[in-house]
From Swiss-Prot:
Pfam family, one: Bac_DNA_binding
GO terms under biological process: DNA recombination; regulation of DNA-templated transcription; regulation of translation
Organism the protein comes from: Stenotrophomonas maltophilia (strain K279a)
Gene: ihfB
PANTHER family associated with the record: DNA-BINDING PROTEIN HU (PTHR33175), INTEGRATION HOST FACTOR SUBUNIT BETA (PTHR33175:SF5)
Protein name per its UniProtKB record: Integration host factor subunit beta
S-S bridge residues: none
Length: 101
């Protein structure tokens, strides 16, 4: 589901709200979440999961075109950990041998 699809579905489900208001709400929520993560804060949405930053240490990578070794610096990357309710909901829907992709 894309952001546009999410906005469209929410606008249909919440018919009393204008589509522009739903669009603004979703974009504001995502902007606030991005800002919190950028500030190093953890975001927890009970029943859904939590977003945090994980540190990736410096490492040696390769340029795929030339095969040349390249030193990659350490960095922080966003990480999502699903909550128990979300894990249970997803595991009950998909059979174990199904490929979600």
């Amino acid at each position: 589901m894309t952001k546009s699809e999410l906005i469209e579905i929410l606008a249909r489900r919440q018919a009393h709200l204008k589509a522009d208001d739903v669009d603004l709400a979703v974009k504001s929520l995502l902007e606030m979440m991005g800002g919190s993560l950028s500030a190093g804060d953890r975001i927890e949405i009970r029943g859904f999961g939590s977003f945090s930053l994980h540190y990736r240490p410096p490492r040696l990578g390769r340029n795929p075109k030339t095969g040349e070794s390249v030193a990659l610096p350490g960095k922080h990357v966003p990480h999502f950990k699903p909550g128990k309710e979300l894990r249970e909901r997803v595991s009950s829907v998909l059979p174990l041998d199904a490929d979600p992709a």
